[in-house]
């Protein structure tokens, strides 16, 4: 079967293969693909992105500056209504307000989930002065909340394409293209 697939895929273009797969409904959902450190592909769009400064890693650990490899669900869009209004998209969404954070304390019971900043734990503030978190999409990395396996892995904004601490980041105009294409069934394949 592998040889047959290699034979077929060597004779048709990526676009043709994608059309065939969509037509046959083999994959009934959209896939965002991040194949390397500076490319994000969705539908017919190839967008520039940046990832963790230590590259892609199947064995993600808290604070290692790598981006986890794998296939993940998109969970929720968080956004700054005061800066960008209410975006139109087909995934669950939530307004980022003062006092919202994400727990990255491996010893805390709320590890890798949204919290209030009043919690006495290590956390990533979601309400920021810069524009990096004007849009955030949380993904299903480490949903079982295994301490030390990584937290706060998002798709968020960048203005410089500097490497991240482990997230995938896009320019605002590209993020807004992404928002128009995704829905609740969309997955992100990293690596």
Predicted regions and their residues:
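Cell wall/extracellular polymer interaction/catalysis modules
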Residues: 27-165, 172-191
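Low-acidity, Ser/Thr- and Arg-rich intrinsically disordered low-complexity segments
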Residues: 2-19, 25
